[in-house]
């Protein structure tokens, strides 16, 4: 569950002229784009930075009262950690920032944190139920536009171990409490179900069959 995200508007892609920059050693020619945040990112300055920190503090207070403990996963993982999300997902196929490091390992910046939390659970084997919360930036190479950005911050919770519908209800209730604490009043809560793993697999197959004849006419 990730109830909040922060990011920025698109940046102009036009090539800017170079200019001289005076430094302590020598003058160097640096293109203007060097002095702008990369496309799909931004600098979060005060007072926005203070508002974001306050939002995280409220979230931490709400979920900690229900027994959730903070986990801080690394910002990059072995790419296989995220490939387990599913090869058919846009995140895996088109949106991951992945690279080979100097040791020859395939690494990816995290596009979300659920997979990292599950990996941490498998590695450290904490007592169950393990109730974890997190906050921090994620990275996706997607088309930068208003409301969707290449670096964005999230807060969220995961519960690992039990298969209990009460856990689902608890997480939904925590989301509601969080929005209330933020002073949001016009919030509508809609609850649905994605079905079982078998249901989802059949649904994906049906969608592929339905759209396969028109693939050339579909946008990415």
Where are these regions (language model features)?
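TRNA-recognition modules of translation machinery and tRNA-sensing kinases, especially anticodon-binding
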Residues: 7-220
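Cysteine-centered metal-binding/redox modules
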Residues: 4
């Amino acid at each position: 569950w990730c109830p909040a995200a922060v990011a920025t508007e698109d940046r102009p892609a036009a090539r800017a002229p170079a200019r001289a920059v005076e430094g302590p050693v020598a003058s160097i020619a640096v293109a203007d784009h060097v002095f702008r945040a990369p496309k799909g990112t931004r600098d979060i300055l005060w007072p926005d930075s203070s508002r974001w920190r306050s939002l995280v503090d409220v979230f931490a207070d709400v979920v900690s009262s229900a027994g959730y403990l903070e986990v801080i996963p690394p910002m990059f993982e072995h790419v296989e950690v995220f490939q387990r999300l599913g090869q058919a997902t846009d995140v895996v196929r088109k949106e991951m920032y992945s690279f080979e490091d100097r040791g020859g390992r395939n690494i990816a910046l995290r596009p979300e944190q659920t997979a990292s939390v599950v990996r941490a659970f498998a590695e450290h084997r904490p007592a169950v139920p393990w109730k974890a919360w997190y906050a921090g930036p994620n990275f996706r190479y997607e088309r930068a536009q208003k409301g969707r950005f290449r670096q964005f911050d999230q807060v969220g919770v995961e519960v690992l171990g039990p298969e209990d519908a009460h856990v689902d209800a608890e997480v939904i209730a925590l989301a509601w409490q969080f929005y209330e604490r933020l002073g949001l009043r016009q919030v509508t809560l809609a609850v649905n179900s994605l079905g079982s793993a078998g249901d989802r697999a059949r649904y994906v197959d049906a969608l592929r069959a339905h759209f396969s004849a028109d693939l050339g006419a579909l946008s990415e």
